[in-house]
Amino acid sequence: MISNGLILAAAEGANPLIPNPWEILVVVVGFALLMFIVIKFIVPTLEKSYQDRVEAIEGGLAKAEKAQAEANAMMADYESQLADARTEANRIREDARTEAAEIVAEARERATAEATRVFEQAQAQIAAERQQAAAQLKREVGSLATTLAGKIVGESLEDDARSQRVVDRFLADLDRHQSAGVAE
């Protein structure tokens, strides 16, 4: 069952390891045609895809770097604004403290002035009431003294002018004795 080709090949005496020159030519032409198609059509398409991908990656990296730079600039701007806001808040707080201290000082001054005014009014009113009470007391003491003296003497001492002089003189003497007693 040996095939006829094998028998012929054995008969011719050709080496089976060395291919036929026509086969080599067909394989070389086929390979060259395949390489031409690959180089002419497939490689440019692959190269274009590769280049597009490289450009997309580089563009993405450039966009990322640009976005990072913008983010850094925005962050620096934000930090600057935040520092300015903190400075402004501190200034406003200090202004408010100063204003509050001024308001408290003014209120304290007004309260002190009002208290002094009320105290002086009260002192003046007390002095006026004391004088009024002293004058009324002198009149009542004089009237009682005249009535009592009239009862002791047994006659009426109703002469107003004369009795008033006596009472005034008595009260003046009494005031002098009290002043002298206080001075001692």
Curated annotation (Swiss-Prot):
Pfam families linked: ATP-synt_B
Cystines in this chain: none
Keywords: ATP synthesis, Cell membrane, CF(0), Hydrogen ion transport, Ion transport, Membrane, Transmembrane, Transmembrane helix, Transport
Transmembrane segments: 24-44
Subcellular location: Cell membrane
One GO term describing the cellular component: proton-transporting ATP synthase complex
Lipid biosynthesis recorded as keyword: no
Source domain of life: Bacteria
Keyword Transmembrane part of the UniProt annotation: yes
UniProt GO molecular function: proton-transporting ATP synthase activity, rotational mechanism; proton-transporting ATPase activity, rotational mechanism
InterPro entries assigned: ATP_synth_B-like_membr_sf (IPR028987), ATP_synth_b/b'su_bac/chlpt (IPR002146), ATP_synth_F0_bsu_bac (IPR005864), ATP_synthase_B_chain (IPR050059)
Binding partners and assembly: F-type ATPases have 2 components, F(1) - the catalytic core - and F(0) - the membrane proton channel. F(1) has five subunits: alpha(3), beta(3), gamma(1), delta(1), epsilon(1). F(0) has three main subunits: a(1), b(2) and c(10-14). The alpha and beta chains form an alternating ring which encloses part of the gamma chain. F(1) is attached to F(0) by a central stalk formed by the gamma and epsilon chains, while a peripheral stalk is formed by the delta and b chains.
Family per similarity comment: Belongs to the ATPase B chain family.
Record protein name field: ATP synthase subunit b
Organism in which the protein naturally occurs: Micrococcus luteus (strain ATCC 4698 / DSM 20030 / JCM 1464 / CCM 169 / CCUG 5858 / IAM 1056 / NBRC 3333 / NCIMB 9278 / NCTC 2665 / VKM Ac-2230)
Lineage, uppermost ranks: Bacteria, Bacillati, Actinomycetota, Actinomycetes, Micrococcales
